[in-house]
């Protein structure tokens, strides 16, 4: 568990630091501020979701041994979480301008263009967490560390590529693509559990 926690603690800040540095040097410090602001909003609600997963979902997965029961728990989680996310993220998107005005100065209003891609990326991120938490619950350290490192690197590479085409919003687009692929990867890793009858 310690190694897994350390891996996440190392890969996430490093990837964000590399991308932030690129935005500052190649685009502008102002737009780097927009992206940082978007990250902070995202971090606030992701912390709440992570905490709730850690309190119930992770211990529940840890205690289950039978593949059928694990699948049932995962499906139940998706049935609860996905509709809630769709409603919550729709509200956040619709109220994005109000949120920016409350939390930041008017100079951050152009940040509203980042919301769609960030929210879509967070949706797939949370959906992938419902599976990746199984890596932690079953102490699949090698798979966890490998995927964390691989997808952090993938995010940085995609971020550089998308930014060259679309500017700072390219990071958020890369974030979405990265977590769609990550979710597919988690489905592949746990295919035997997910498709058990």
Model-based region annotation:
Residues 1-5, 22-43, 109-112, 168-173:
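Interfacial/gating helices of multi-pass transporter permease domains
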Residues 67-91:
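Membrane-water interface segments that mark the loop-to-transmembrane alpha-helix transition
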Residues 13, 40, 122, 148-153, ...:
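Residue-level recognition of pore/gate-forming positions within transmembrane alpha-helices
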Residues 49, 53-57, 126, 130-134, ...:
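C-terminal transmembrane helix end/exit motif
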Residues 38, 42-66, 134-137:
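Helix-loop junctions and terminal segments of transmembrane helices
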Residues 29, 75, 94-123, 169:
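Interfacial segments at transmembrane-helix termini and the short loops linking adjacent helices
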Residues 120-150:
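Membrane-interface junctions at transmembrane-helix termini in multi-pass inner-membrane proteins
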Residues 98-101, 142, 152-184:
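Membrane-interface helix-loop junctions in multi-pass transport and translocation proteins
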């Amino acid at each position: 568990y310690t190694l897994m926690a350390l891996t996440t603690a190392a890969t996430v800040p490093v990837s964000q630091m590399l991308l932030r540095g690129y935005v500052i040097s190649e685009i502008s410090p102002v737009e780097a501020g927009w992206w940082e602001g978007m990250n902070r909003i995202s971090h606030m609600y992701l912390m709440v979701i992570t905490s709730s997963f850690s309190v119930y979902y992770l211990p529940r997965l840890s205690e289950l041994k039978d593949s059928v029961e694990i699948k049932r728990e995962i499906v139940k989680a998706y049935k609860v979480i996905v509709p809630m996310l769709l409603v919550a993220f729709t509200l956040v998107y619709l109220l994005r301008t109000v949120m920016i005005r409350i939390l930041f100065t008017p100079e951050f209003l152009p940040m509203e263009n980042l919301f769609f891609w960030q929210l879509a990326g967070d949706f797939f991120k949370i959906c992938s967490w419902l599976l990746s938490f199984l890596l932690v619950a079953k102490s699949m350290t090698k798979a966890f560390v490998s995927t964390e490192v691989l997808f952090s690197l993938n995010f940085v590479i995609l971020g550089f590529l998308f930014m060259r085409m679309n500017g700072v919003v390219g990071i958020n687009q890369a974030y979405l693509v990265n977590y769609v692929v990550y979710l597919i990867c988690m489905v592949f890793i746990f295919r035997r559990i997910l498709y058990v009858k």
